[in-house]
Amino acid sequence: YQLRAVTKCCENYEKGIRKCLLVMATGTGKTRTAASIVDVMTRSELMGKVLFLADRKELVKQAKDAFYKYIENTTMCNLLLNKDERNAKIIFSTYQTMLHAIDTIKNADGSRFFSPGHFSLIVIDEAHRSIFNKYKAIFQYFDACLLGLTATPKNTIHQSTYTFFDMKNNIPTDVYEYEEAVEKDHVLVPFYLIETSTQISDDGITYADLDEEEREAYEAEFVEDGGVPEHIPPERINKYIFNVDTVDRMISDLMNNGIRHKNGNHVGKTIIFAQNKLHAKFIVDRFNELYPQYKGNFCKLVVCDEPYAGQNLKDFKKADDYPFITVTVDMLETGIDVPEITNLVFAKKVYSRIKFEQMLGRGTRLCENLFGEGEDKKEFVVFDYMRNFQFFDEHPKGREAGEVVA
């Protein structure tokens, strides 16, 4: 499927079609596919320099690291870290940094270093309408071919995205979605929704009920670098999520019914998505109160501005080491590859379809020998306390508490 996508894009560019859009489920190799397209087009000298844009610095770093693995003997530069290497063949940047660089980085004669013709191709990581609205000046300035990447399901991509990429009849250049990856090719694992002991009541509003302006507003929250602006929940949600009994039952649900580590003594690698930083800290504090035997090591906080967030995340990536649970708001939604994750807890209300898909994507990756020699990861489970699946009109397979085993 990656080869098919690479072939279609390269053929389009050769024909003079300047815009391509790839829809690929999280975990199926969007970055690797993009790197292959860049490699083919630059080695054939059909394209010169390339710009890779992402909306967060963590994703910029991850993309550059991935390209290094896939493309040999090509100069690369993370513009956020080293503007001195700006002559590189491939530049990686956030939208904000590039927008600033266009005006501020100059040649010796005072002219702009990044001229309109500097790049032959711009790769847009997670292409969606908020990006084009907020940073359209970049795409208006550079005269380059475009390659859009998105994990958003084809039938939920906004019309304006298709229009931006000149997709006739709303048909992307190539599509490879979660269902095909799971059911046909088995390159991702399925998930099951666990019936939880408590859920917040709501007004029955779904994503389909939102008008375009409301959807636009929610998706726009997802564009900022360094962390998404936290949605301020209604008072009723605040009262619910900061309730000791609610959080204690949520933790109990996870510890009793989550997929367990191969040792059978406790749950496997887990991400809890909290509503905001205060809520995340509240969950960690309640866990430590309920399980003092772990001495604060089992469940850790991974949020922006937390001094030990980086180390906690590094430790979380170690398959058999503490912590086994990380509590986050936005840091672990995208760009974090931990195949050992078997449990996701949605303790936050999500209004962005993009964010929802990326949160789910944290659990979809295959993992060999996770439960011992020859016993691979076959599934993961999701605990949803905020009716997010109902909001997005998703009806996945469910299980009652107690059905899940290692």
Locations of regions flagged by a protein language model:
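Conserved RecA-like ASCE P-loop NTPase motor core of nucleic-acid helicases/translocases
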Residues: 21-23, 48-56, 268-276
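Conserved RecA-like helicase motor-core motifs
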Residues: 21, 49-51, 64, 71-83, ...
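Conserved helix/coil segment N-terminal to the catalytic DExD/H
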Residues: 81-90, 96-117, 136
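ATP-dependent helicase/translocase motor core
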Residues: 1-49, 58, 62-73, 87-90, ...
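Conserved RecA-like P-loop NTPase helicase motor core
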Residues: 96-99, 121, 299-403
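SF2 helicase catalytic motif II
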Residues: 96, 110-148
